[in-house]
Amino acid sequence: MSSKSIESKNPSIKFGPLIRASQFFYTKSNLITALLATSVFAGYLLFFLTGKGKAFEVANSSIKSLGTSLGFGQVEILAFLAERSDQMINDYINFNQVWDSLFALIYGVMYVAWVSILFKPYSKKVGVLNLLPFAQVLFDWFENFSLATLSKQFLADGTISSSTALIASTSSSIKWVFSLLVYGVILVGAVMRIVGAMKRRSQR
């Protein structure tokens, strides 16, 4: 029997690493780890990432940030880069490649921990749903490295690639769609846990 036929009969073989990662977070996540991850997220955002962002901040800029908007075009990207010095653009490249990419991983782990806690009693039904936040992280990384590539090109010749700009914009839009989905999943999970607790209480 071929390996392909075995995989078709047993999908868990094909998606083994994904399933193991999902089970790991369901097993290890608890209120303490989720609160710890949330504290790391808040501390990194307030005391570190914000400071790194000020390195390329321009007073009264028409476009203060690209990554926080729901998509953007070539005009917005060019306007953003044209307002900044070469040193600011280099800082922006470093910000996207290192600090903001690390931030994405931090918030991804935090959201995965919370989703894992909320859906732990239903883990066999919802499967790898707890890994949904990592999809947001993935597209955040696509956006970051696309913006870094565009910034490097702008420094080199003053232009940007339309195809790379489209990748950056599309990745940003998809990132925010997944963000809304994650918040929706967390809300549904919280409601399910509250309703479940109320039912158990009424049965006593």
Regions found by a protein language model. Name each.
Residues 2-24:
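Short, Lys/Arg-rich, polar N-terminal cytosolic tail immediately upstream
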Residues 22-29, 85-95, 121-128, 160-174:
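Membrane-interfacial loop-to-transmembrane-helix junctions in polytopic alpha-helical membrane proteins
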Residues 25-64:
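N-terminal signal-anchor transmembrane alpha helix
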Residues 30-38, 116, 121-138:
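Interfacial segments of alpha-helical transmembrane regions
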Residues 34-49, 108, 113, 183-193:
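Hydrophobic core of alpha-helical transmembrane segments in multi-pass integral membrane proteins
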Residues 53-93:
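Extracytosolic (periplasmic/ER-lumenal) interhelical loops and adjacent juxtamembrane/interface segments
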Residues 95-116, 183:
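Hydrophobic alpha-helical transmembrane segments
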Residues 136-191:
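Alpha-helical transmembrane segments of multi-pass integral membrane proteins
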